Amino acid sequence: MESKNKLKRGLSTRHIRFMALGSAIGTGLFYGSADAIKMAGPSVLLAYIIGGIAAYIIMRALGEMSVHNPAASSFSRYAQENLGPLAGYITGWTYCFEILIVAIADVTAFGIYMGVWFPTVPHWIWVLSVVLIICAVNLMSVKVFGELEFWFSFFKVATIIIMIVAGFGIIIWGIGNGGQPTGIHNLWSNGGFFSNGWLGMVMSLQMVMFAYGGIEIIGITAGEAKDPEKSIPRAINSVPMRILVFYVGTLFVIMSIYPWNQVGTAGSPFVLTFQHMGITFAASILNFVVLTASLSAINSDVFGVGRMLHGMAEQGSAPKIFSKTSRRGIPWVTVLVMTTALLFAVYLNYIMPENVFLVIASLATFATVWVWIMILLSQIAFRRRLPPEEVKALKFKVPGGVATTIGGLIFLLFIIGLIGYHPDTRISLYVGFAWIVVLLIGWMFKRRHDRQLAENQ
């Protein structure tokens, strides 16, 4: 590959650490958590802890391979190297499909959040505006992207911490609630902690895993990280603490100060909770934060697909034109392709603004879980491929080795079973498997084309 089509290593440890902090703090938490709360009640806290453990196992498996061999197409390349070309092809394209679906959910959420302030403006106008703005940002240098993502993430992380502190002020001292402490009795006084039974908590796991979708972007940043051996482990090791603080902490506060069964879905439950309590100033600030979070998520979505398609083009799994980069090292063709695909979200928000999110979230969960399964299978094959002395020399090993990875794999297969069990999300399983069939057909055509090219040479 010519040097002019190479990506540039412009992401510092600071950029990558905050991308790790911010990557999973987005639409799944700020908006999708409402559906998870409805399914499980307060026991959704336990679901987020269980899902968080699985997410950390996936990140450690990806981190082990990323530190050993940092590459822009990351898990697609690892699947190709360890499981074969077909696995790499399916993984790369399914990740692009996943992130496109997630991005549609993110831009849809952006329109919903803007609707809180401007209820008379159609959602699709906001969706179109944000798609064009993010496209422009991603056509600049990777350093501009990293800097913008740093400040997006810094702002939402800082505000969530302030919100948690303020929430404890309401819980303990009644600040902003007329001096009346709310306590934490709401966690059990509306049907108990397991208000919808154990089954409700288990069923919520699919929405919980949607919230964690996107964390795998840290593997993709390895190709543009200045010092992947330091930055990747630091970023991944921050995962357990951020799950406890940002997911469990925020939802603990929300469900303590406001009954879980009155959390609505007409906007972010974070915003609606403060609105219902009459603290409109806090609600307005939080709406601005969730807007920032969705912008950050869309920004990362476009970045992730762009780098994945670029790497796949280098591997021969995507059209060669996708490997083209600008003078600044930006894969501009793939950024424009992603932007064009996102215009479909504008159309969806025009024809069915009320029902877009839940359908898209379940479809994204299937694609996300599929990619995670391929990451874990790649790590198992990667370990088997290495001689024992090289396994010992690995700089960032999965704790517990392959046994831990297999445990994560069983959990993810269970999540796919849940998607098929739930009537509202079963269709996403059909669409997901149809997507895999389409990819297999595409692979057959690709192989035939490659053979013809080889014969003609």
Swiss-Prot record:
GO terms for molecular function: amino acid transmembrane transporter activity. The chain crosses the membrane at residues 18-38, 39-59, 85-105, 114-134, 157-177, 198-218, 243-263, 278-298, 332-352, 356-376, 400-420, 425-445. It is a multi-pass membrane protein. It is found in: Cell inner membrane. GO terms for cellular component: membrane; plasma membrane. GO terms for biological process: amino acid transmembrane transport. Residues 1-17, 60-84, 135-156, 219-242, 299-331, 377-399, 446-457 are cytoplasmic. Keywords: Amino-acid transport, Cell inner membrane, Cell membrane, Membrane, Transmembrane, Transmembrane helix, Transport. Pfam families: AA_permease. Coiled coil: none annotated. Permease that is involved in the transport across the cytoplasmic membrane of proline. This is Proline-specific permease ProY. It comes from Escherichia coli (strain K12).
